[in-house]
């Protein structure tokens, strides 16, 4: 029986899954929006939300904990200097997952994962 198993395996080894979510988290922090498949997006939420929660309190311990999960100095700096303060008043739910149709090659359901309250690009501010 499969009772109490949490999380999707996504047909990957644990190391591959961990690396994939690490790369997705760094990309999300850098661009504040990523495109991926719907199952990956839903599973990714479980990885990204706790990182932003840790970034709300800027301490050396939290920075080291986040760095141990991301392994990217620029991403950690942006997370603690920009994103943490941005979501200070929000008690969770920092991501929005939007369905965006199906991929042309294999008909996989696609999704956009974006940070809430993200600033619009300069071209759309008019």
Swiss-Prot record:
One of its GO terms (cellular component) is cytosolic large ribosomal subunit. Keywords: Ribonucleoprotein, Ribosomal protein. Signal peptide: none annotated. It comes from the Bacteria. One of its GO terms (biological process) is translation. One of its GO terms (molecular function) is structural constituent of ribosome. It holds the Pfam family Ribosomal_L17. Belongs to the bacterial ribosomal protein bL17 family. Part of the 50S ribosomal subunit. Contacts protein L32. This is Large ribosomal subunit protein bL17. It comes from Nitrosococcus oceani (strain ATCC 19707 / BCRC 17464 / JCM 30415 / NCIMB 11848 / C-107).
